[in-house]
């Protein structure tokens, strides 16, 4: 596994981008919501395109090394929806009021006069919620990078963009509750460490059985996880921050850039 350490490094960098989000929230008075809308839409486009055009076909190709073509198609399909169910089940563990993808206060908190204890609780629960979400995201980056390092770089970048507003979601309420930039940044930074931790745990569990059928199934599950993240988190959050058409423009641009990248790297 010569690609093990680069894959882990990519996962770590993607996770720690929550720290970038918290720094932006603490330094910049007003968040550029149009940029966030475009960036989140772009990330969704990249993840959707790469899931259907690259990961699923690669999953079936890997599965074919250990089973007939029809069986490979069935396993890839079941693993894809299994990945969707896995991330959906994790989402159900997080109450809506603490769910980082249901918040609309980022960049507008200074306009409110909220209760500091409630804000602090919200920030801490948001950090825990994001840490839970980061587990499967870390696995997605890690196993994609193990499969193809260039693909891993692309997915790590899109997950990193996705993590920036999540870092803001943690830092803003904690800062306004405690007036401590250090505490707000620390909680945000630590929540990002769940991504490499998720990668390590996932790899440790699957390593004894990491045959072509298992690896192919994991790739299909990763595709399912990324599709769910795109449709349930990235696009709704993008639209919450800005205009519908701007989010869709980012989505199409992300697909186009990913398509061009795959053609150039082929």
Curated annotation (Swiss-Prot):
GO terms for cellular component: plasma membrane. Its main location: membrane. Keywords: Cell membrane, Ion transport, Iron, Membrane, Metal-binding, Transmembrane, Transmembrane helix, Transport, Zinc, Zinc transport. Fe(2+) binds at residues 134, 137, 163, 166, 195. It is found in: Cell membrane. PANTHER family: ZINC TRANSPORTER ZUPT, ZINC/IRON TRANSPORTER. Belongs to the ZIP transporter (TC 2.A.5) family. ZupT subfamily. This is Zinc transporter ZupT. It comes from Chlorobium phaeovibrioides (strain DSM 265 / 1930) (Prosthecochloris vibrioformis (strain DSM 265)).
